[in-house]
């Protein structure tokens, strides 16, 4: 059963898996929760090739921004006022770019198109926070790469709010 955990915090785990497909495209995966179980989960092939894993992660977050905004608008319209929206990612370089925008680009990331910095505007407007999530705890890995054994069952349990 899906339910909110009472903290009024919308949490979204986003991950990009670099060059997963034969055509060298990357994979975006994400899951959103109000505490107990996922309210939105997605896994999509990215529409463009990327040069770095940082760019893959930035595009993954950009791909899921409409889901974040729409869900927050729907929740507010239904009377559920969230205190915070937190986006979790496991790539510190992508987090830096998302928070600071183009000005924190280096020679490895200055080619990234400005359209992928929509998330920076949302961060600066205080519509969401961006936090680091260690790779071993990244629930979105469930949607971007093949998992085996313990991790598969751990993430499935979190996403579906299953009991032991």
Model-derived features: positions:
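Structured nucleic-acid-interacting core domains from mobile-element enzymes and related host factors
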Residues: 1-14, 80
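Generic recognition of flexible, low-complexity loop/linker segments
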Residues: 1, 18-20, 74-75
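Beta-strand cores of modular interaction/reader domains in eukaryotic scaffold and signaling proteins
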Residues: 1, 13, 33, 88, ...
């Amino acid at each position: 059963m899906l339910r909110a955990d009472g903290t009024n915090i919308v949490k979204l785990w986003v991950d990009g898996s670099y060059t997963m497909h034969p055509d060298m495209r990357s994979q975006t995966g994400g899951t959103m929760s109000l505490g107990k179980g996922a309210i939105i989960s997605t896994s999509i092939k990215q529409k463009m090739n990327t040069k770095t894993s940082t760019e893959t992660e930035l595009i993954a977050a950009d791909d899921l921004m409409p889901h974040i905004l729409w869900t927050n608008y729907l929740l507010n319209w239904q009377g559920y006022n969230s205190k915070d929206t937190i986006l979790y990612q496991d790539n510190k370089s992508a987090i830096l770019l998302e928070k600071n925008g183009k000005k924190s680009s280096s020679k490895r990331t200055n080619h990234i198109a400005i359209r992928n910095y929509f998330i920076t505007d949302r961060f600066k407007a205080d519509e969401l926070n961006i936090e680091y999530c260690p790779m071993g705890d990244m629930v979105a890995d469930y949607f971007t790469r093949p998992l085996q054994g313990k991790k598969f069952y751990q993430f499935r349990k979190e996403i579906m709010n299953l009991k032991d």
